Amino acid sequence: MTSISNVSKGSIIRFKGEPHIIESLVHRTPGNLRAFYQANMKNLKTGRNVEYRFSASESVDLIVTERKQYQYLYRDGNDYVMMDNDTFDQINVQELSIGPSARFLKDGINVTIIFSDDGSILDVELPTFVEVEVMETSPATKDDRATSGTKPATVETGAEVSVPMFIQCGSVIRVDTRTGEYIERVKK
């Protein structure tokens, strides 16, 4: 157990029996009231966001974690098969552990898997940006290129991304895996 004042953003704690990652932690001292810490956390099992006020003297259970690099190999039903970059051992990761960014997983991409002290998978972090090829989108006309609108495009992983009008089939684009938004066209 450690004091809440020693916890920072990105720490993983056991809150109400389940692992939560601290997304933001703000110390507040309102007027003549006692100080407290306002925490925004994400439940790593359910993916839900939780807000909680910790008193300044409260202690929390900090989970000891280990981060390892893995390479995505293929999908097996609802599981994703990953290979350890050091030992070449393969593990199955549930879709829930990866979250909505799983739609941007493509063969050979490196991910960071966070393991808890008991060996269970807490979280899977994809790279912030990935480069994917546009497989299907409506063709752009000369008039469309002058406007700043967007159109839907299906990328090689099967995800749908909203892209500018000038993007065509075969274009390689950079996408933010956290939000699923188009960032830029990659010139090769």
Swiss-Prot record:
Q: Name one GO cellular component term.
A: cytoplasm
The pathway that the record names for this protein is: Protein biosynthesis; polypeptide chain elongation
Would you identify the family this protein belongs to, as annotated? Belongs to the elongation factor P family.
Give the matching Gene3D superfamilies: 2.30.30.30, Nucleic acid-binding proteins (2.40.50.140)
Q: Which Pfam family is one of those matched by this entry?
A: EFP
The biological processes this protein is annotated with in GO are: peptide biosynthetic process
Q: Could you tell me which PANTHER family the record lists for this protein?
A: ELONGATION FACTOR P (PTHR30053), ELONGATION FACTOR P (EF-P) FAMILY PROTEIN (PTHR30053:SF12)
Q: Which InterPro entries match?
A: Elong-fact-P_C, NA-bd_OB-fold, Rib_uL2_dom2, Transl_elong_fac_P/YeiP, Transl_elong_KOW-like, Transl_elong_P/YeiP_cen, Transl_elong_P/YeiP_CS, Transl_elongation_fac_P
Q: Which UniProt keywords apply?
A: Cytoplasm, Elongation factor, Protein biosynthesis
Q: What does this protein do?
A: Involved in peptide bond synthesis. Stimulates efficient translation and peptide-bond synthesis on native or reconstituted 70S ribosomes in vitro. Probably functions indirectly by altering the affinity of the ribosome for aminoacyl-tRNA, thus increasing their reactivity as acceptors for peptidyl transferase.
Protein name listed in UniProt: Elongation factor P
Q: Does the keyword Protein biosynthesis apply?
A: yes
Q: Name one GO molecular function term.
A: translation elongation factor activity
Where it sits in the cell: the answer is: Cytoplasm
